[in-house]
């Protein structure tokens, strides 16, 4: 099939270039800066908000919506006053991306909830990365726990999807997270690191990757994940990246929290040092609540 | 009454905004047989369904290439049957061989999808078909029967079902399916429906051919008594799709 629109591709490439410049600017200039204390690191992150350390809030609408409910939600989002220093992305179902792209403010970027593993062709029911670029979709969520555990996508399949999407200039929200039985067996980090390794084996340039930690163990199990538990995993993932990829990637990448986030708990979560934003589920379908979650970036600044 | 000829075009994972505009233009301007003679459905990727639906001439219907197995909710990446209904997309293709083989969809999963889609008011193109290995081991009818049984165990009303036979054994294997081979399976499948569902369902259900269909072979295939139309692949993206639609007139000749 034909290559994606050269205009869209070129535009996204330029965005990617700017982001890469941002990463370089934000990276520590000397090894000893890696030993900076916590408060200094937080201050540095605030200063670096113009780069890839910027707070990130994504809304995953999942398999929800009607033409009317989408229209109402878009109206609410368009009317909201959003803080400037936060990247905002919404992920409608495939079938509503056209409607959302045509009506949503361009302050908010659009993501797909999945994408095919390679070039388009004889793959009935799938959507390719080239098609996402063609329709103006900038992001894709990959490896979401519902696709891992309900659909049966394995780590390697997901890693290859991420590599292909990035190669087509689609930015990736890469999801990881462990089940309750895995957590209770003391395997939280083993599972998350294994999932991270599958991404790392496939990804060469992390500039356009955001990592989302989903505490699957607390989803629908009656357990509640505390901000401290979220922070613990985020810090461990960042350390893993530092050791297994590079210190530059570890410090520049956004690691966002994909557990239960709502207007009531977002400020507390945002204060955690290694929580760089959220991948919001049900609350992203409520315009005013989602706006409150987006604006919790101010809590990050207060904490710093 | 006789079975109305049915031509579905499965675009698969193809198309850009510009290409879609061109295809829709070809379809809108094409001279096609009347809706009394042929029912035409085209199936773009999800992301193009709204634009195709809004631009396509009303005589040609639109299908999704898949949908989720039950009510929508926490199923990231999926599109539910009720979403399709909400957008006035009347048809859905289910159980396509590419989803059975590449996405691991089982007979039971496909059967559940068909039942749920029908329950929400969608019409279904339900796909069945055997691989080369299965055909060469003499299992063609066993495989097709098992796939069809998984659907028939879950539904009562076949009014809104079209069955598509895909000779997977002849897709990308270098083998070519002849019209006689297509007819043999269609006849076997219709006999299976008569024996296992009812004579009425067997007589009224359209069984369409989902193998390689082109402008060159469509008329010969359409002439087969148990071939009630096509589920077209690559040719559905091309002007020759109009010729394939018009092969419907072979039935009334």
From Swiss-Prot, chain B:
Top-level taxon in the UniProt lineage: Eukaryota
Gene3D superfamilies: Aldolase class I
PROSITE patterns: TIM_1, TIM_2
Coiled-coil regions listed: none
One Pfam entry name: TIM
Pathway annotation: Carbohydrate biosynthesis; gluconeogenesis; Carbohydrate degradation; glycolysis; D-glyceraldehyde 3-phosphate from glycerone phosphate: step 1/1
Active site: 96 (electrophile), 166 (proton acceptor)
Alphabetized GO MF terms: triose-phosphate isomerase activity
Catalytic reaction annotation: D-glyceraldehyde 3-phosphate = dihydroxyacetone phosphate
Entry keyword set: Cytoplasm, Gluconeogenesis, Glycolysis, Isomerase
Major location (coarse): cytoplasm
Any one annotated GO CC term: cytosol
Enzyme Commission number(s) of this protein: 5.3.1.1
Record GO biological process: gluconeogenesis; glyceraldehyde-3-phosphate biosynthetic process; glycerol catabolic process; glycolytic process
Residues noted as binding substrate in the record, renumbered to the chain: 10, 12
Compartments where found: Cytoplasm
First-tier enzyme category under EC: isomerase
InterPro entries: Aldolase_TIM, TIM_sf, TrioseP_Isoase_bac/euk, Triosephosphate_isomerase, Triosephosphate_isomerase_AS
Keyword set includes Cell inner membrane: no
Additional free-text comment from the UniProt record: In plants, there are two types of TPIS, cytosolic and plastid.
NCBIfam families in the cross-refs: tim
Family: Belongs to the triosephosphate isomerase family.
Matches recorded under PANTHER family: TRIOSEPHOSPHATE ISOMERASE, TRIOSEPHOSPHATE ISOMERASE, CYTOSOLIC
Subunit structure: Homodimer.
Protein name: Triosephosphate isomerase, cytosolic
UniProt source species: Oryza sativa subsp. japonica (Rice)
